[in-house]
């Protein structure tokens, strides 16, 4: 196991600093082997393309989807979320191992920016989902048992409906995430 010296004062990483001892370093290989790994690049490329495809295929069309098509849409959105989560988890955990490392800070910032840009085309999903009449969703659930398992997720999203802003403001707030994280 690789260990990292735990420094009392993060701003002074010199050998003369007082150490609290050695701490274990996270093994992030289950996520990605390194910042240049082909898997990481493949996930970033896939995410960029899939976000665009998802928006092209489903934006403005949720109300017209059959139960099985709606399930496909939800599963694709879920996969996008999982890949995004994997990317940001790797970048974040790597950064938190050594917050004074400029390269790690830049890598985290770059990943955050890419995910924010790629996912901006997905803002429509929750907004459209919240515009669907309750009756519409209630009619879809009995048609597809697997889709009905997502009802608690939809209920949680729809509970925020009273606080939903216009599409333009929601997109602006999403895009401000890049600036806010800088």
Language model segments and positions:
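A well-structured
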Residues: 1-182
């Amino acid at each position: 196991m690789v260990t990292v010296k735990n420094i009392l004062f993060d701003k002074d990483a010199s050998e003369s600093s007082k150490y609290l001892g050695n701490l274990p370093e996270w093994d992030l290989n289950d996520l990605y082997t390194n910042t240049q790994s082909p898997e990481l690049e493949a996930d970033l490329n896939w995410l960029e393309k899939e976000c665009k495809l998802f928006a092209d295929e489903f934006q403005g069309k949720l109300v017209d989807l059959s139960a099985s098509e709606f399930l496909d849409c939800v599963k694709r959105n879920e996969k996008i979320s999982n890949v995004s989560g994997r990317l940001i988890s790797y970048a974040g955990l790597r950064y938190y191992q050594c917050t004074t490392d400029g390269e790690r800070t830049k890598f985290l910032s770059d990943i955050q920016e890419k995910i924010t840009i790629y996912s901006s085309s997905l803002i429509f999903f929750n907004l459209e989902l919240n515009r669907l009449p309750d009756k519409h969703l209630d009619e879809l659930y009995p048609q597809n048992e697997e889709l009905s398992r997502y009802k608690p997720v939809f209920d949680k999203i729809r509970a925020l409906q009273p606080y939903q802003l216009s599409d333009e403001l929601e997109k602006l707030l999403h895009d401000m995430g890049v600036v806010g994280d800088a």
